[in-house]
């Protein structure tokens, strides 16, 4: 049976149209989550429909803070510790494929951040001073 060039072109086009969605679904399924503070904007979590279901790890003296970044530990009683031995435990959050949820009162633009220490509000990729967090 001979196939004309036109038939082959239609066959190739149909195969591409059918295989492209399959390829995209496969790639999306292979994407792993990442630590809530080190994902690129619009990156891994943007395609992940699962919301964080676990609290971020405790850190700091006597575990009174919470991890809000790979080397950042914040708490109401301790402020924010960055790059200190007490914040080193926060590196373990990077090993988890599931993002964690930072606890604290909502703050920031459109209430997308959380108060993590006295006067400090952290959003997805940055922390700043915020009078709502007092």
Curated annotation (Swiss-Prot):
Residues 1-33 form the signal peptide. Keywords: Cleavage on pair of basic residues, Disulfide bond, Secreted, Signal. Pfam families: Hormone_5. Disulfide bonds join 34-39, 56-100, 59-73, 67-90, 74-80, 107-121, 115-133, 122-127. Expressed by the venom duct. InterPro entries: Neurhyp_horm, Neurhyp_horm_dom_sf, Neurohypophysial_hormone_CS. The keyword Cell membrane does not apply. GO terms for cellular component: extracellular space; secretory granule. PROSITE patterns: NEUROHYPOPHYS_HORM. Residues 44-50 form a propeptide. Gene3D superfamilies: Neurohypophysial hormone domain. Its main location: secreted. It comes from the Eukaryota. It is found in: Secreted. The keyword Disulfide bond applies. GO terms for molecular function: neurohypophyseal hormone activity. The cysteine framework of the terepressin is C-C. Belongs to the vasopressin/oxytocin family. This is Terepressin/terephysin. It comes from Terebra anilis.
